[in-house]
Regions:
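C-terminal intramolecular chaperone/autoprocessing and neck/assembly modules of extracellular spikes
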Residues: 1-66
């Protein structure tokens, strides 16, 4: 399933690891919660098929396919 993962929506971003695809894994604040995941802009550079643009203009990641 796709979920919002655009860098512009995240605050207090801290890199905590590296995904097997070579992109960073981050902890960040988004939508009022501390979360963990990738940044869509980084993932789009290596796997554009896992990223789509929402009607709002923000990028979403298919976390189910990661």
């Amino acid at each position: 399933a796709f979920a919002f993962s655009d860098r512009r929506l995240k605050r207090n971003i801290k890199r905590v690891g590296t995904h097997v695809l070579g992109v960073g894994i981050y902890e960040f604040d988004m939508a009022g919660y501390r979360q963990r995941g990738v940044i869509a802009q980084e993932l789009e550079a290596v796997r554009p098929d896992l990223v789509k643009r929402h009607d709002s203009g923000y990028l979403m990641v298919n976390y189910g396919a990661l």
